[in-house]
Amino acid sequence: MLTLKIAVYIVVAFFVTIFIFGFLSNDPARNPGRRDLE
């Protein structure tokens, strides 16, 4: 039961981190580094 709760917290933290990174990357400019990578 404890490992299940830890796994749930890890998954939630993972999605929250992805959401925060996506929001920060889209906030200042619209895709600033994509043309440099291509």
Curated annotation (Swiss-Prot):
Its biological purpose: One of the components of the core complex of photosystem II (PSII), required for its stability and/or assembly. PSII is a light-driven water:plastoquinone oxidoreductase that uses light energy to abstract electrons from H(2)O, generating O(2) and a proton gradient subsequently used for ATP formation. It consists of a core antenna complex that captures photons, and an electron transfer chain that converts photonic excitation into a charge separation.
PANTHER family: PHOTOSYSTEM II REACTION CENTER PROTEIN I
Keyword Nucleus on entry: no
Keyword annotations: Membrane, Photosynthesis, Photosystem II, Reaction center, Thylakoid, Transmembrane, Transmembrane helix
Pfam assignment, any one: PsbI
Coiled-coil annotated residue ranges, if any: none
Record-linked InterPro entries: PSII_PsbI, PSII_PsbI_sf
Source species of the chain: Nostoc punctiforme (strain ATCC 29133 / PCC 73102)
Protein's name in the database: Photosystem II reaction center protein I
Primary localization: membrane
